[in-house]
Amino acid sequence: GGMIKRAALARALALDPRLLMLDEPTAGLDPISAAAFDELLMDLRQQLGLTVIMITHDLDTIFRTCNRVGVIIDRRMTSDTLEGITRNPHPWIQSYFHGERARRFGQEASKNGT
């Protein structure tokens, strides 16, 4: 799984893009492979000056790699910094980013100031 995703990323980067769009890039990867892919993506983004637009439901990836987040709620897009989104009072956003599954990531992000 991880090698296939890395090969797909390499093919996309061969075109020397300024914008990279990824759809669920860590889906199907075990946690260690997903973390390695996130690290690779962050390194490439920094080294190549890429703008990355990513669709993901992976909270690990969101908290590790994103500096801005967009969420579609009630057929409308809302976006902000990660900290701003996690403070949004909408019940779905609160449940998603502060629910049982998300608690440890939110606490980690708060500690890191992201």
PLM region spans:
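A short, proline-enriched helix->beta-strand linker immediately N-terminal to the Walker B motif
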Residues: 14-18
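Catalytic Walker B motif of ABC-type/P-loop ATPase nucleotide-binding domains
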Residues: 20-23
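Helix N-cap at the start of a conserved alpha-helix in ABC-type nucleotide-binding domains
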Residues: 31-33
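Helical segment within the ABC ATPase nucleotide-binding domain
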Residues: 35-47
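H-loop/switch region of ABC-family ATPase nucleotide-binding domains
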Residues: 56-57
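A short, surface-exposed alpha-helical micro-motif characterized by mixed small hydrophobic
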Residues: 62-64
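C-terminal boundary and immediately downstream tail of ABC-type ATPase nucleotide-binding domains
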Residues: 83-114
